[in-house]
A protein has these predicted regions:
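Cytosolic juxtamembrane N-terminal segment immediately preceding the first transmembrane helix
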Residues: 1-27
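Residue-level signature of the transmembrane alpha-helical cores
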Residues: 23, 85-89, 93, 109, ...
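Residue-level signature of mid-helix packing/kink "hotspots" within the transmembrane helices
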Residues: 32, 60-68, 152-153
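Extracellular/periplasmic helix-loop-helix junction of adjacent transmembrane segments
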Residues: 37-64
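Helix-breaking motifs and short loop linkers at transmembrane-helix boundaries and internal kinks
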Residues: 46, 78, 99-105, 116, ...
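Conserved MFS/SLC helix-loop-helix module at the cytosolic interface between two early adjacent transmembrane helices
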Residues: 65-104
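Cytoplasmic helix-loop-helix junction between adjacent transmembrane helices
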Residues: 111-148
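Small-residue (Gly/Pro/Ala) motifs that create kinks and tight helix-helix packing interfaces
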Residues: 151-160
């Protein structure tokens, strides 16, 4: 489905690519940001190293599971609602992680983060496919992929700060 870019996005093309890249990098960024804080979180919650590892496993399980469905949901309900619901759910889950009083709560909220963050990756690629012709889509995907690769490099620095 090729839609006209001018009806979908009124700003410059690079701003759309930047927005889609940020949405796409949210998943890997949210993993690598909190890993440097493992020991501090474990100490604050009285958690064992195995329990802390479960927070990562729960996130990745939710992320992998919902990657199967975000595309179908975006096809059924539209790209924008799926991204917005994903961002709202991710924001609520992030607040829940920050306010967790024990490791069980943290695991639950990390699972919710994983369930929601895949929307950015899956739907951003669908948007590129929808509105750009194949030759332009390759360039936009290259820009998005650069950010996707930079996120794991920047995240530990920010998380350890």
């Amino acid at each position: 489905m090729q839609n006209d870019l001018s009806t979908f996005w009124r700003g410059p093309r690079w701003t759309l690519a930047m927005l889609l890249a940020i949405l796409g990098m949210l998943g890997p960024f949210s993993v690598d940001t909190y890993i440097p804080a493992f020991s501090g979180i474990a100490k604050a919650l009285g958690a064992t190293p195995v329990e802390m590892q479960q927070t990562l496993s729960a996130y990745l399980l939710g992320f992998a599971f919902m990657n199967l469905f975000h595309g179908a949901l975006a096809d059924s309900f539209g790209r924008r609602p799926v991204i917005l619901w994903g961002l709202v759910m991710f924001t609520i889950a992030s607040a829940g992680c920050a306010l967790s009083q024990n490791i069980t709560q943290l695991v639950i909220f990390r699972t919710l983060q994983g369930l929601s963050t895949g929307a950015g990756i899956v739907v951003s690629r669908a948007i590129v496919r929808d509105i750009f012709p194949p030759t332009q889509a390759q360039g936009v995907m290259a820009q998005i992929t650069i950010f996707f690769g930079v996120a794991p490099a920047l995240a530990p620095v920010i998380g350890g700060w």
